[in-house]
Amino acid sequence: VAKYVKDGRLQKLLSFQTLYIGISPYNGPSIYTIIPMIESIYGVWFIKGGMFTMAKAMASLFEELGGKINYNCAVEEVLIQNGKSGGLSVDQQKIKSDYVVCNADFPYAMKNLIKESTYKGKYTDKKIDSMKYSCSVVLMYLGLKKKIDGLKVHNIIFADDFDRNISDIFQGNDPKDPSIYIYASTKADSSLAPQNKEALYVLVPVPDLSARKKRWTDEEISEYKKVIFSKMKKIDGLKDIENLVEYEKIYTLNDFESRFNAYNGATFGLAPTLGQSNYFRPHNKFMPIENLYFCGSSVHPGAGVPIVLTSAKLAAAELRRDVGSL
């Protein structure tokens, strides 16, 4: 970007989007500069009710088509027999199936759900540990007791020293002066909060576990919340942010790792480096095991909600192709 745009503010505006997929704008493949172009020229879709509406709609369609969803079940293993996936071990019970589609984070699945090293292919435990991972985030969901006129739908507060900010993230240091993205969903959809109140999604890129080398302590989370709030006070109406919050939920790499099985707490999965993109990214059809398919942010084509949905479409297409060949 700097080759064509000399103003440092515009450079940040046109390059920070690589953080949407957890990679440094200084090291990411230049193809990702297409993101701000798409946003500016075509815009982005908004789903009334938020992304949970998408999840509910997909679940509803799945059930309409005859599918059954089992909630609150721990998947322990992909069962393999004679080189074919034969079902799952769930809560210590074996459930047989002809095909398995796995949307668990690929590195986690390789290390925990595929038990026999024979069937891991090139993705051995050593290989998984040596791969490059995206950054993590500190994610805050905040409910405010009143409307804030100074907020837009999308709000970005850049670090004063953006270069240092990015360097800290990918060298394992919690940024002391972070860049912050604030999504005020209620500015686009008032149904997402009670009347005259505001719902905020606050995202702060930070190191993943492979870079940070340690999990967050409660004390560190509490202190970093102060750093984030201090930064948010730059927005008109948020000078007393501490007194406005009546609901708060904070996620760190600890939660992404424990709750969502994101390997290394890397929010966006495997980093989309040149050597981990396109053909070189884990495929949607897992060749070492017949009838096993993957979707999600760590497999082709990559991270981000629209891209992960595309990943699911590709996995479904591979499955349909194989079913049709029977």
Predicted segments, located by residue:
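Hydrophobic, well-ordered secondary-structure elements that form the walls
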Residues: 101, 142, 202, 232, ...
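C-terminal segments that line or cap access tunnels to active or ligand-binding sites in enzymes
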Residues: 145-251
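Beta-rich nucleic-acid/ligand-interaction surfaces
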Residues: 68-90, 246-262
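A glycine-rich dinucleotide-binding beta-alpha-beta segment and adjacent secondary-structure elements
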Residues: 7-21, 177-181, 238-301
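A conserved FAD-binding loop/helix module that cradles the flavin
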Residues: 297-319
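Conserved redox-cofactor binding core of oxidoreductases
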Residues: 2-54
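Mid-domain catalytic core of redox enzymes
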Residues: 46, 76-194
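Helical element adjacent to the flavin cofactor pocket in flavoenzyme catalytic cores
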Residues: 34-85
